[in-house]
Amino acid sequence: MSKIRIYELAKELNISSKKLITLLLEEFGVEVKNHMSVIEEEDADLIKEFIEENEDKEEYLEDKYKNLPEEKSEKFKKNAGNTVKIADKNKSKQDKAVKDLNEQVSKENHKVEIEDTITVKEFSEKIGKPITEVIKQLIFMGVMAAINQEIDFSTAEKLGEKFDITVLKKKEDIDKGVAEQDEDEDEDTNVEKRPPVVTVMGHVDHGKTSLLDAIRKSKVTATEAGGITQHIGAYTVTINGEKITFLDTPGHEAFTAMRARGAQITDIVILVVAADDGIMPQTAEAINHCKAANVPIVVAINKIDRPGANVDKVKQELTEYQLVPEDWGGDTICIPVSAHTKEGIDTLLEMVLLTAEMQELKANSNRNGKGTVVEAKLDKGRGAVATLLIQNGTLSVGDSIIVGSTYGRIRAMFDDKGNKIKSAGPSIPVEILGLSEVPAAGDRFHQVKDEKTARDIAEKRKQKIREEYLQSTHKVSLEDLYNQIKEGKVKELNIIVKADVQGSIEALKQSLQKLSNEEVKVRVIHGAVGAITETDVTLASASNAIIIGFNVRPDSNAQAAAEKESVDVKTYRVIYNAIEDIKAAMVGMLEPDYKEVILGKAEIRQIYKISNIGTIAGCYVQEGKMVRNCKVRIIRDGIVIFESELASLKRFKDDVKEAAEGYECGLSIEKFNDIKEGDIVEAYDIEEIKKKEL
């Protein structure tokens, strides 16, 4: 880096070298030896900025530097050289004009943003404080850092507190192209009504696909092996001139997996319940998933054409899950339907549109497209294929998009019927070709100005987005629950309860919910009979919940998923223990207590000094026992003079594990040789005890 001499800089600034030398010392804490000394060009730029800011204060400069003491001038002339160093003395006063400027800066900027590290000089400039003040505070903090040395974020944060300035971590601008576009377009108020996105959920064999088939008026079920949905699809239907987009349910796992990734794509859930079967375990799971995601539910009571169908019984069961039908005074829409005879289908769709109208779903189609990946796969003939749900804007063939850490230019676009289309608007599902890699379901996509921008963002995201996503939500565990409550990270403790019998679930739910207090609310989001499954872990991960199992164990898949997702799974055989552990965690009682246990006492009766070994004490065990490698304290005249560990323990010439009461032994103390006859060696151990009572 180039350097500049003092006299050259003074000439540029049109001031004397003497004034410049004094300015450097008093304003920047930099001591130079004489006019031939050199400084870095970047430091010279700072000085120029300072002079320019004060150029209309010429009288101030003249008054300050015209009467420069002779002794100071002499000091600068001594030991001529070319070095520059930070002055390590504390200045007695600061220039009034600079103070006024600093006060103004601090009033206007109480917050500054920095990256992971910052140099001391850059930090000084950011907060508008003289470098000497910053270095002085660092020294008080025990950090010895020169002007160009870097400090980390935590140090900068503490340093900012010294100046009453909040230091924030600057988010890495890897999505600059996307962010700029969003800022420009978010101001656009040209929004219009968009179709609702509906997911169909329910228990196996309750007729989800048949209902969707009836709605679409096409025989999808007949083409699928065993009547089981083989793929995740998205379809659009039209009723009374209005569109509804259906996601052919990916099942509860994918529903919650998407939500765990931050992708909320469903506006309304149609919950399918068979009239002749009632609420089943997967139905209950679906209800809990919807509640956790805060998605409105429209209940379709299916198979009303079958003998044994009992609509009222289903409605009664729904009330147990706080879903009270409208005709019973509640706010849950329940529509009896038959996928077979198509009875009630139109009414169901009208109710979906009514629910959507209440939600006031809006989007702006006159902007660049963005949305979520519903499914993606690698096709041998076509490459990476992704089904996208456009949530805002319009997407067209030829557009460049960024999808998670993948990018591409749309080569072809197909609608839900497989027809080629050129563009699509909000709430419309499309299948696209042209991505560089297969994205993950739940990834967000954004349209950007060109493929180069998309590629640059994707490359940066590949380095950071995955780890940031995994770290974005800190999973709750009993061990650190108290700390998270205190830090304000946890306001609500979500719990999933699995047990061997229904009675145990009810008992646990009631007891756990009674633990709620002002700081944290305990909420049982799901309870079911049976082993802990991968589905439970997925829900726990999405809802940041703890899983409690009573007389049940997680299966191998659930264990692997829990480890991968950092979900806390606790199993118990006694309900009381589960309640006490949650209670203890909430008040911070899972931190262990330590208790000292006295093992024994021995009196030193003879001293042996052995070269290369040290001092050996011949002892008589008066109480308890002496144990090899145990902790000991040396007591002389009732006063503890040293604490250490037993280095060795012998009886006669043999090493022994312990010496019992009434026996003699020889021992040596780790790192201590100043023992005397009559000293007492007290052996003890530290036991860890977990508190179980509040």
Curated annotation (Swiss-Prot):
PROSITE patterns: G_TR_2. Pfam families: EF-G_D2 (PF22042), GTP_EFTU (PF00009), IF-2 (PF11987), IF2_N (PF04760). The keyword Protein biosynthesis applies. GO terms for cellular component: cytosol. Keywords: Cytoplasm, GTP-binding, Initiation factor, Nucleotide-binding, Protein biosynthesis. Residues 338-340 are annotated as: G5. Residues 248-251 are annotated as: G3. Residues 193-362 form the tr-type G domain. Residues 227-231 are annotated as: G2. Residues 202-209 are annotated as: G1. Residues 302-305 are annotated as: G4. GTP binds at residues 202-209, 248-252, 302-305. It is found in: Cytoplasm. InterPro entries: EF-G-like_DII, IF2_II, IF2_N, P-loop_NTPase, Small_GTP-bd, T_Tr_GTP-bd_dom, TF_IF2_bacterial-like, TIF_IF2. GO terms for molecular function: GTP binding; GTPase activity; translation initiation factor activity. It comes from the Bacteria. Belongs to the TRAFAC class translation factor GTPase superfamily. Classic translation factor GTPase family. IF-2 subfamily. PANTHER family: TR-TYPE G DOMAIN-CONTAINING PROTEIN (PTHR43381:SF5), TRANSLATION INITIATION FACTOR IF-2-RELATED (PTHR43381). One of the essential components for the initiation of protein synthesis. Protects formylmethionyl-tRNA from spontaneous hydrolysis and promotes its binding to the 30S ribosomal subunits. Also involved in the hydrolysis of GTP during the formation of the 70S ribosomal complex. This is Translation initiation factor IF-2.
